Swiss-Prot record:
Disulphide bridges, residue numbers: C4-C52, C14-C28, C29-C74, C50-C88
Residues passing through the membrane, by range: none
Keyword terms, alphabetized: Allergen, Disulfide bond, Lipid-binding, Transport
Entries under Gene3D superfamilies matching the protein: Plant lipid-transfer and hydrophobic proteins
Family assignment from sequence similarity: Belongs to the plant LTP family.
Record CDD domains: nsLTP1 (cd01960)
Tissues in which the protein is found: Expressed in seeds and, at very low levels, in pulp of fruit (at protein level).
SMART domains: AAI
Stated name of the protein: Non-specific lipid-transfer protein 1
Species the sequence originates in: Actinidia deliciosa
Role: Plant non-specific lipid-transfer proteins transfer phospholipids as well as galactolipids across membranes. May play a role in wax or cutin deposition in the cell walls of expanding epidermal cells and certain secretory tissues.
Record-level GO BP terms: lipid transport
Length: 92
């Protein structure tokens, strides 16, 4: 299963982008790709990652727009949204 430690480690390089905006770093996009591979095909992994992302998003105010654009800016299609308001039980 996916742990919150793994999710946090993958997205730590994105904190500057998420809190200040601009362009995500190469390390950040690499973390996003890593997160995509972690959440690949198994629903429990996606739901676990979703819950971790919700907790992480709740720790930082004002990251909503930056977080929503992150996968697009990195050119990675995530199966899990980075949002405080996602109902993780509905992710399939």
């Amino acid at each position: 299963a996916v742990s919150c430690g793994q999710v946090d480690t993958a997205l730590t390089p994105c904190l500057t982008y998420l809190t200040k905006g601009g362009t995500p770093s190469t390390q950040c996009c690499s973390g996003v790709r890593s997160l995509k591979s972690m959440t690949g095909t198994k629903v429990p992994d996606r739901q676990a990652a979703c819950n971790c992302l919700k907790q992480a998003a709740a720790r930082y105010q004002g990251i909503k727009d930056a977080a929503a654009a992150l996968s697009q800016k990195c050119g990675v299609q995530l199966s899990v949204p980075i949002s405080r308001s996602t109902d993780c039980s509905k992710i399939s």
